Each structure stands twice: as C-alpha cells, then as structure tokens.
Amino acid sequence: GVPIKVHNEDVGSIILERINPIPFSAENQDSLIFFGKILGSAIFWLKEYDKLYQDATHDGLSQLLNHQTFKERFQEEILRAERFQHFITVIMFDLDKFKRINDTLGHPYGDYVIQTVSNILKENVRAIDLVSRYGGEEFVVILINTSAENARPVGERIVKTIAEYPFDYDS
C-alpha cells in the first residue's frame, strides 16, 4: 500500500491485493506511488475549492448563506415550488435595536449576537430549508414545502428562543 498525503500529512492510503501469489513489480509500485501523489493533490485542490465556494456563498460572520446566494437559491426554490405545486414560506427576522447593542456593548458583542442568532435559526429549521443573513441584522428563512399556517409555529418558536436566550458573552 501507499499513503495519500496532502502537504506531508497522511489523509488516507491505497491498498491493493492480488488473488494470485505473484508480487507486484517495481513498475507497479512506482505507478501506485505516483497515483497516491496525484490523488493527494486532487484532494488538496478539492479542499481549496470547498473553501473558496464557502467564502463566495456564505457570510463570513454568521456562516449562513450570503445575500447574493440567497437571491439565487430563492429563485430556484420558487421555480421548484411552481413545478411541483408545493408551498414555500419566507420569514424575515430583524433584530430590534441592534445598533444600540453595537454602540453600547461593542462590536465583538454584536458579532457574538449575530453568530448566536444564526445558530438558533439553523437549529430551528430542517436541513432542506434555507437560512440567510440578508443584511446587517436581518435574516431570512425559506421553509420548503411549508404553508404559512405550518410556518407560523416555526417563526414563533424562533422568536421565543431568541427572546429567551441569555446571551452571556465573555470577551
């Protein structure tokens, strides 16, 4: 077998077995080593692409979809809802008096609030739903295949969870 390395760090291995007892030739082994290096390089570039994609499509602070990606995905979901004849519901959240939080408690605390609210939103919707940071302290949730009647308890639960959260922050 040969290791698969990314920057001299083992990330996997390739192991080959033969049914017959004939050993692999030196040329076979060299080819396998070369393949392991190519595979390691491919894994490295795939990880780099994933980082670039994440940076391009997600808000850096909240790790939610960014505004542009939200608009693109929203259009896709509208078309999907029309095609499959199902509902989508959009819920918009705005943090009241957020400027006052930044002005009185500082921007690090404001960042903590944004990150905490982002986590609350993600934890209170399904994996198929979309959550986005729409603007400074504005968030949008798209509930897929969900009527307004069924979305209301979700929105109320999120508002209640945010309102009751202690927001303890140690700088």
Show which residues each predicted segment covers.
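A short, aliphatic-rich beta-strand micro-motif
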Residues: 1-5
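Amphipathic alpha-helical "output/dimerization" segments
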Residues: 6, 23-44
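Short beta-strand-to-loop transition segments that serve as allosteric relay/switch motifs
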Residues: 7, 12-23
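Short regulatory alpha-helical coupling segments
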Residues: 53, 67-86, 118-126, 144
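Conserved nucleotide-binding and Mg2+-coordinating catalytic segments in signaling enzymes
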Residues: 53-72, 93-107, 115
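Short catalytic/binding micro-motifs of nucleotide second-messenger systems
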Residues: 80, 123-128, 160-171
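Alpha-helical scaffold within the catalytic cores of cyclic-nucleotide enzymes
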Residues: 118-119, 150-167
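A short pre-motif secondary-structure segment
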Residues: 130-133
